[in-house]
Amino acid sequence: MQNQNDFDVVVVGAGSAALNAALSAREQGSKVLVLEKAPEHLRGGNSYFTGGLFRFAYSGLEEIVDLLPGIGPEEQSKIDVGSYDNSDFYADVMRVTEGLSNPDILQILVSESYPTMIWMRDQGVPWILAYGRQAFEHEGKLRFWGGLIVESVGGGKGLSDRLFELCQNAGIEVRYLSAATELKTDNKGKISGVIIKGPDGYES
């Protein structure tokens, strides 16, 4: 009989990145546990308090329309999204980190950013154009700037609530008031588990 604490993947934290990682692991067939040290009513980490804007590389309007198929021809004619390619994204991250980002990892982040947006949409995360904060009117069109075109419906709260709903629907267990305190390793140094401090004390 399988122990109730036997999981293939343990995700520590319950922000946007964590919950997407949990969904991805579950999609691959893994039994997944998410640990959230906050109580349920304060769940979601920093993601809950963000505006829900997402930065990703894209080549132009066609890719934005592919991501947001609800944008009809009339709306398309009234907007200018420009482009924000891989080199733009890469350069911006290197600029704000003063060149300290790992180049190889950053290249993966940049090149996978648009496919990840498509994947999140297909999982059930709804996106909309960020008219309110990232567009200004110029020569009869609403022009987007700064490489930020899209936001999640409902901002950070909407994103967080939706991701928790998707995790629940996928059969992913979330434990609240539960913090990872230590990694367990086998005699070869391979990670084999995690020590959890929960409401009833420590467990593994």
What kind of feature is each model-predicted range?
Residues 3-17, 33:
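Beta1/beta-strand and adjacent pyrophosphate-binding region of the FAD-binding site
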Residues 48-87:
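N-terminal glycine-rich dinucleotide-binding loop that anchors FAD/FMN and/or NAD(P) in oxidoreductases
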Residues 104-203:
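Conserved redox-cofactor binding core of oxidoreductases
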Residues 3-7, 199-204:
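Core beta-strand elements of the Rossmann-like FAD/NAD(P) dinucleotide-binding domain
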Residues 27-50:
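Glycine-rich FAD pyrophosphate-binding loop
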Residues 75-80, 92-108, 149:
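Second-shell loop/turn segments in exported
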Residues 43-47, 60, 132:
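Short, solvent-exposed loop/turn and secondary-structure capping segments
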Residues 22, 26:
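Gly/Ala-rich phosphate-binding loop of Rossmann-like dinucleotide-binding domains
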